[in-house]
A protein has these predicted regions:
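General marker for long, soluble alpha-helical cores
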Residues: 1-182
Length: 182
């Protein structure tokens, strides 16, 4: 098994979103990390089977695990760039995400002009990545939500929930863009 795959399966401390869990410095020893990783695996009910590297999408996700949350956020910002501009949030994006939103990859969701918040964008990023990951193993699907901070109840309109035909290309391009600039 590849080292990058092992850390996804057995070392959630190394990649879990810091708002879900942050390891205190006093517990940063190898023994403590091992125990806390076991607790996290149990607490979240994470399976410990094998990642199916013969599944090209699963292999792709494993290879780019470190940038998935950032790439998903970039994809959501790209898709809803019109709403971001309308609400004056475009220039509050980090430079990398702002630059990615300027690429002409997909059309913007111009049908939505309501209030869009950072929490809403995080939820949309999560949805982009879960849609992209629809045909991967349960082991991967269980771990993807942990890349994001715990999702609050978000009052979303139906315009956000529509399935996107261009999700595959948008997320792949965002991953490549994030990886190149990581």
């Amino acid at each position: 098994m590849h080292a990058d795959v092992k850390y996804i399966i057995y070392d959630p401390i190394s990649w879990i979103h810091p708002k879900r869990f942050s390891l205190p410095k006093k517990l940063a020893t190898a023994r403590c990390r091992s125990i806390i990783n076991d607790i996290i695996l149990h607490q979240y009910g994470l399976s410990t089977g094998d990642i199916d590297l013969s599944n090209s999408k699963e292999n792709y996700l494993a290879h780019h695990w470190a940038v998935l949350a950032k790439a998903a956020f970039m994809a959501a910002c790209h898709r809803y760039r019109s709403a971001l501009a309308y609400n004056g949030l475009m220039f509050k994006l980090d430079p990398l995400t702002f630059q990615f939103t300027q690429c002409e990859l997909t059309g913007s969701r111009d049908d939505f002009r309501g209030d869009i918040t950072w929490g809403c964008l995080r939820f949309l990023a999560y949805r982009e990545l879960m849609t992209f990951s629809s045909d991967v193993s349960l082991l991967m699907k269980e771990r993807i939500p942990l890349l994001f901070e715990k999702q609050a109840e978000v009052n979303m309109s139906d315009s956000f929930i529509l399935q996107q035909n261009d999700n595959e290309i948008l997320v792949r391009m965002a991953i490549q863009y994030a990886k190149r600039n990581h």
